[in-house]
């Protein structure tokens, strides 16, 4: 029995020696992103693996808009509060604002660099380019909307409604009929983004703040005291200014944009602003039918809730398919951009390491999504195009 057992053991050892070795388990890593520890390094010379871990596909349809071989890139940093990007197809540059830094910048496409453009900028906030390539800007400090003509001159489009000074025009879009539509919340009616009211005004009830101190343009302060509720306005080329959405309908309007066919107007309602007596907006996005010079059929487009997190919207743009790309002011991991279909379905998002205020499509093909996020400018190459103009 002992000899037979030894022989059997030898056979088993031989069989084990001939058995193929098992393959070791695959070893894969987790690419750094905005939410890993350590987090992603956004400085130059630190490329991301493809597909970019901060470009998140929620619905398969998003893959047709967000290619797997493109990365989100930080183009520049150095702002205090970056806002209002708009693309000039004639000049091949992106203009954007540093609201609290009181400076406008240009990102030059060919040079791939950011340079100062206007300083002081009158705390310019939102910008756009009209159908003739002229820059439209909302000035928080002067509480007005202006247009820069091709000869370099400045035209004031609107600084009052029915003789009362505007609050602080915030975002602006042109219409093919030559009209200009803009929002007028109160966010620039404070010291860091523009100037507070004169003594006794809603944003300076005790009169302790001095609006003109240290302001290089104090002599042309517009809107001494807040006199109007928040609203959305339409300026007609004839010079007529109409209030098309009231504060009762939609408090604290902020970002706005048209659908590609100009049949729908989207408006963001953000939170309570300085001097507001009401509760402010709910940080939601609403849609309106455009009927000539008026709007109708107000409806909720999205409440901007994701995983129980309120992704507070600020600015937005539509692409040629009618998708809405909306900025997200939310905690890390949800800050960035959310993409919705025209039916209001969330299909994808882009995470950024900073809160995103506004965005615009640009580049020669108008396929680059530029994102103004707090102190930085980011860009991502898509496979769609922005609905022109910027």
Predicted segments with their positions:
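Blade-level signature of beta-propeller repeat domains, shared across WD40, Kelch, NHL, RCC1
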Residues: 360-390
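A short loop-to-beta-strand structural motif that recurs across blades of beta-propeller domains
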Residues: 103-105, 144-146, 231-233, 284-286, ...
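Blade-edge beta-strand/turn elements of extracellular beta-propeller
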Residues: 65-77, 113-120, 148-163, 231-250, ...
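Beta-rich, blade/repeat-based domains predominating
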Residues: 77-92, 120-139, 144, 162-182, ...
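Short loop/turn segments immediately following beta-strands, especially the blade-tip
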Residues: 288-294, 382-387
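Beta-propeller domains
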Residues: 89, 93-113
């Amino acid at each position: 029995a002992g000899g037979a057992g030894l022989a059997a053991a030898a056979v088993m050892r031989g069989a084990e020696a001939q058995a193929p070795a098992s393959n070791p388990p695959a070893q894969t890593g987790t690419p750094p992103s905005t939410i890993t520890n350590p987090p992603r390094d956004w400085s130059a010379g630190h490329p991301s693996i493809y597909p970019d871990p901060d470009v998140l596909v929620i619905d398969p349809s998003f893959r047709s808009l967000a290619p797997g071989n493109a990365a989100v890139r930080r183009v520049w940093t150095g702002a205090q509060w970056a806002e209002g990007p708009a693309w000039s197809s004639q000049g091949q540059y992106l203009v954007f604002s540093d609201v609290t830094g009181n400076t406008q910048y240009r990102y030059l496409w060919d040079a791939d660099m950011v340079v100062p453009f206007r300083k002081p900028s009158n705390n310019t906030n939102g910008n756009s380019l009209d159908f003739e390539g002229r820059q439209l800007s909302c000035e928080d400090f002067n509480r007005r909307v202006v247009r820069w003509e091709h000869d370099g001159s400045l035209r004031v489009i609107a600084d009052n409604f029915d003789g009362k000074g505007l609050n602080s025009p915030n975002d602006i879009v042109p219409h093919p009929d030559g009209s200009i539509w803009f929002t007028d919340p109160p966010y620039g009616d404070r010291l860091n983004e523009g100037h507070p009211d004169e003594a006794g005004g809603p944003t300076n009830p005790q009169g302790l703040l001095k609006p003109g101190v240290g302001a290089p343009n104090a002599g042309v302060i517009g809107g001494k005291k807040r006199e109007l509720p928040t609203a959305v306005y339409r300026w007609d080329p004839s010079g007529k200014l109409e209030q098309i959405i009231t504060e009762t309908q939609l408090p604290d309007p902020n970002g706005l944009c048209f659908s590609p066919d100009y049949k729908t107007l989207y408006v963001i309602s953000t939170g309570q602003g300085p001097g507001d007596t009401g509760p402010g907006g709910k940080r939601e996005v609403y849609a309106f039918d455009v009927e000539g010079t008026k709007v109708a059929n107000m409806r909720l487009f999205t409440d901007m809730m994701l995983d129980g997190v309120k992704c507070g919207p600020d600015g937005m743009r539509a692409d040629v398919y009618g998708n809405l790309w909306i900025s997200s002011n939310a905690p890390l991991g949800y800050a960035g951009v959310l993409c919705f279909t025209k039916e209001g379905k969330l299909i994808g998002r882009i995470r950024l390491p900073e809160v995103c205020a506004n965005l615009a499509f640009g580049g020669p093909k108008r396929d680059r999504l530029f994102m103004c996020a707090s102190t930085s400018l980011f860009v991502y190459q898509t496979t769609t195009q922005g609905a022109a103009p910027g």
